């Protein structure tokens, strides 16, 4: 099992989260690939520019290295995976190509990180976190919030996941531009068979039975969108992505809408 995060330094020997690291300069985001960079969208395509206006890129530390994906929920709140938490975070919105300055981009400082109180870093249960921005984002064509779903998705529901993670696995290749892939919500029995005694109500699996399409390392915290609403967040999966019979595992946001709303109200 592997978390779909990218970190800095050497590769961890155990499960990894999907995090992608890049350096954001004052006016341009230049992507850097560390030894831990291993996952991106597999089997997808370059997203149409501004087609995922809620997509966020999390930037960690004073060097503003790209860490994870996320989704804009309101002018001042972003949601991501809990395992993406770091002491210093900024959020880049309105991005398409991480290697270029873009007129649509906005980079905002995170002033508050609220991890779900029951997050378990060992089991990856309750893997979500809310980020409060220092100032509201400017909403427009390239930057727009998405609503968290009220209802849990039924098996077979068509969804889309997006991110800047690796486009190949196990050998990593990272794209400059945001990638999208269409996948389906997996039946519970498929999810349980792939990951026995591991899946909780706070998790949902998504992929395609034949494999070849998946989120991957570098995509952690990114949005799984079904029928125009935010259904999940990239959380974890197999070390090698897009294997037949092993869908990706996502935070099941239909189980957390009340907590999300209460947290965003409690400023």
UniProtKB/Swiss-Prot annotation:
Tissue expression summary: Highly expressed in CNS, bone marrow and fetal liver. Also expressed in breast, thyroid, kidney, colon, pancreas, spleen, prostate, uterus, small intestine, placenta and skeletal muscle. Among 40 tissues tested, the highest expression is detected in skin followed by breast and prostate (at protein level). Expressed in stratum corneum by sweat ducts and sweat glands and detected in sweat (at protein level).
Active site: 83 (charge relay system), 127 (charge relay system), 220 (charge relay system)
Name the record gives this protein: Kallikrein-14
Post-translational modification: Proteolytic cleavage of the activation peptide produces the active enzyme.
SUPFAM superfamilies recorded: Trypsin-like serine proteases
Role of this protein: Serine-type endopeptidase with a dual trypsin-like and chymotrypsin-like substrate specificity. May activate/inactivate the proteinase-activated receptors F2R, F2RL1 and F2RL3 and other kallikreins including KLK1, KLK3, KLK5 and KLK11. May function in seminal clot liquefaction through direct cleavage of the semenogelin SEMG1 and SEMG2 and activation of KLK3. May function through desmoglein DSG1 cleavage in epidermal desquamation a process by which the most superficial corneocytes are shed from the skin surface.
Catalytic activity, EC: 3.4.21.-
Stretch forming the signal peptide: 1-34
pH-dependence of activity, as noted: Optimum pH is 8.0.
Propeptide: 35-40
Family in the record: Belongs to the peptidase S1 family. Kallikrein subfamily.
GO BP terms in the entry: epidermis morphogenesis; fertilization; negative regulation of G protein-coupled receptor signaling pathway; positive regulation of G protein-coupled receptor signaling pathway; protein maturation; proteolysis; seminal clot liquefaction
Organism: Homo sapiens
PROSITE patterns given in the database record: TRYPSIN_DOM (PS50240), TRYPSIN_HIS (PS00134), TRYPSIN_SER (PS00135)
Keywords noted in UniProt: Autocatalytic cleavage, Disulfide bond, Hydrolase, Protease, Secreted, Serine protease, Signal, Zymogen
């Amino acid at each position: 099992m592997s978390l779909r995060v990218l970190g800095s330094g050497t590769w961890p020997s155990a499960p990894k989260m999907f995090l992608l690291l890049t350096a954001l300069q004052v006016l341009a985001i230049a992507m850097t690939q560390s030894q831990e960079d291993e996952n991106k969208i597999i089997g997808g395509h370059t997203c149409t520019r501004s087609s995922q206006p809620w997509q966020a890129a999390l930037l960690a530390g004073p060097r503003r290295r790209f860490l994870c994906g996320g989704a804009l929920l309101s002018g001042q709140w972003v949601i991501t995976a809990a395992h993406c938490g770091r002491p210093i975070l900024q959020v880049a919105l309105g991005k398409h190509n991480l290697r270029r300055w873009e007129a649509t981009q906005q980079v905002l400082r995170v002033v508050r990180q609220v991890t779900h109180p029951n997050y378990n870093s060992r089991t990856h249960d309750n893997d979500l976190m809310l980020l409060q921005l220092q100032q509201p984002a400017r909403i427009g064509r390239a930057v727009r919030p998405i609503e968290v779903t009220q209802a849990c998705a039924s098996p077979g529901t068509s969804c889309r996941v997006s991110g800047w993670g690796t486009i190949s696995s196990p050998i990593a290749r990272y794209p400059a531009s945001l990638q999208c892939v269409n996948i389906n919500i997996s039946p519970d029995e498929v999810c349980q068979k792939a990951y026995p005694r591991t899946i909780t109500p706070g998790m949902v699996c998504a992929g395609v039975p034949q494999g070849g399409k998946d989120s991957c390392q570098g995509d952690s915290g990114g949005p799984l969108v079904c029928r125009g609403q935010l259904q999940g967040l990239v959380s974890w999966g197999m070390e090698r992505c897009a294997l037949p019979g092993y869908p990706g595992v996502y935070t099941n946001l239909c189980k957390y809408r009340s907590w999300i709303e209460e947290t965003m109200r409690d400023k």
